[in-house]
A protein has these predicted regions:
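Generic beta-sheet signal
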Residues: 4, 135, 143-151
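Acidic, low-complexity terminal tails and accessory targeting/binding regions
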Residues: 1-2, 75, 85-98, 138-144, ...
């Protein structure tokens, strides 16, 4: 069995405003930096053999904070980026509904094929995640791998590992700075811990 530690990046100014940042390279907020440090403390006793992160700063800095004092380098990959919202980047859902009513309608229907103007679709993001999943296959039994990325990216990865149709990705909840733990076996994967944020209690 290999063990996967899935971490969603910490808070950003954009997340506080409930805006869609996608590929926009926003920084962690002061709260997000504190969350990353609390994650480091939470995982301090874990043996971690490899660390992967999205190459967007909010994920990279979260991963680097967790990795502080370890010998492993953080491997940053564009395949782990959040979905590209294109023209919708920086907008909130109310603004999207006013400016792009048809896009908002299709989003509510969870259309996998919906491509954001100037951006990408969930199907295309799912393809990126598949490429990363193949990279994970090189890690052997007994290894623990930390993956720091974004909400949709991690949820699609979970679906793929669990053998679930990717259209169910939105039915998992992953909060900011949350920890999810999975075990992978030749016959499939097991979800051991989902969306755990106990490390944030009293530390926000």
């Amino acid at each position: 069995m290999s063990r996967l530690l899935l971490v969603r990046h910490g808070d950003t100014e954009g997340n506080s405003a409930e805006r869609y940042w996608g590929h926009t390279d926003v920084k962690l907020s002061a709260a997000g930096l504190r969350q990353a440090e609390l994650l480091r403390q939470r995982l301090a006793m874990e043996k971690i053999d490899a660390i992967y992160a999205s190459d967007l700063e909010r994920a990279t800095v979260t991963a680097q904070t967790i990795a502080a004092g370890r010998s492993q380098l953080v491997i940053t990959l564009p395949d782990l980026r959040e979905i590209n919202f294109g023209e919708l980047e920086g907008l909130n859902f109310t603004e999207v509904g006013k400016q792009y009513p048809e896009i908002a309608r299709l989003w509510r229907e969870r259309r996998m094929s919906l491509r954001y103007p100037g951006g990408e679709s969930i199907e295309e993001l799912d393809g990126r995640v598949s490429q990363f999943r193949r990279r994970l296959e090189k890690h052997g039994a007994g290894e623990t791998v930390l993956i720091v990325a974004h909400s949709a990216t991690l949820r699609l990865l979970m679906c793929q590992l669990l053998g679930l149709p990717s259209q169910h990705w939105w039915q998992f909840r992953l909060d900011l700075a949350s920890l999810t733990v999975m075990g992978t076996y030749p016959a499939g994967a097991i979800l051991n811990l989902l969306n755990d944020v106990c490390h944030l209690e009293g530390g926000k």
